[in-house]
Design a protein with these regions (language model features):
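Bacterial N-terminal signal peptides that target proteins for export
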Residues: 6-16
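Intrinsically disordered, glycine-rich low-complexity segments
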Residues: 1-5
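Intrinsically disordered, low-complexity proline/glycine-rich segments
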Residues: 30-252
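Bacterial N-terminal signal peptides
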Residues: 15-27
Length: 252
């Protein structure tokens, strides 16, 4: 009888330890409801494109793209290397985007992050730009550039990565995007962006983030029937891959 009780107690303790370890290792977003991105503007009437189909794909594999009226293919690559204290993480994405009205556009996005690691602490080394997307259709070209965030001289914990993005359109106009770090109903700012807002002359025209429980690319209703809607969509697509790739793999 005593042996049976001891055996049951052992199994009980092992079960408790298992669930405790599981709770500790599973990210918070897997256990609790994920709040929507706080865009600071009303996007309730925006056109949305669900980005779920862009997840869970193998590296180097060419994947089919189907988002609303858009079709095409995309291929995403992530690689890292390290020598002594110096490390490097590279990402690149090739996208062929086909739309009945706007034709075929080719997008190539790439980024590189250089790191210096000592005593188990990793420090990013500043680049002139962190990420760039070239978008071409014949002689038409648009360019998206993600600038490095301003690193504080001293920070307790991870700093908030406030990102500025420059987007040059084929006609020479320049629009911008800014990173978003707050979620609806919460005051705390997340270190990594939880979305981006695309802005033209101070007015939000699109973005990426979480809206109504879905991760989406957003196009403001006021530009939905204009050529700018297509350019905002491509910019959002480039930013989605930047945000997706700007996460260190647990295998690094």
């Amino acid at each position: 009888m005593e042996e049976w009780r001891a055996g049951m107690l052992k199994k009980y303790i092992i079960c408790i330890l298992f669930w405790l370890s599981l709770i500790i290792t599973i990210p918070a977003f897997a256990l609790f409801k994920i709040p929507d991105t706080d865009f600071g503007v009303n996007f309730s009437e925006a056109v949305t494109y669900d980005t779920k189909s862009l997840l869970m794909k193998f590296n180097y594999k060419t994947n089919d793209l189907k988002m609303g009226p858009y079709t095409g293919t995309w291929k995403n690559r992530k690689a890292s290397s390290k020598f002594l204290m110096f490390g490097k993480r590279k990402t690149s994405t090739e996208i062929t985007l086909v739309h009945e009205a706007y034709g075929t556009w080719f997008m190539f996005c790439s980024g590189i992050l250089k790191e210096f690691e000592i005593y188990g602490f990793s420090f990013d080394r500043q680049n002139e730009i962190d990420y760039q997307c070239l978008m071409r259709n014949g002689e038409k070209e648009a360019v998206l550039i993600v600038l490095p965030f301003q690193k504080p001289k001293f920070s307790m914990g991870p700093p908030v990565e406030n990102r500025q993005v420059k987007i040059t359109l084929p006609d020479g106009r320049e629009i911008k995007a800014v990173s978003l770090h707050k979620t609806v109903g919460h005051k705390r700012s997340h270190p990594k962006p939880v979305g981006y807002k695309i802005v033209n002359e101070g007015k939000a025209i699109g973005g990426i983030g979480r809206l109504e429980k879905k991760n989406v690319i957003l196009i403001g209703d006021e530009i939905a029937d204009t050529d700018d809607a297509h350019l905002a969509f491509m910019s959002g697509l480039g930013l989605w891959f930047f945000q997706h790739n700007d996460r260190k793999s647990p295998l690094d």
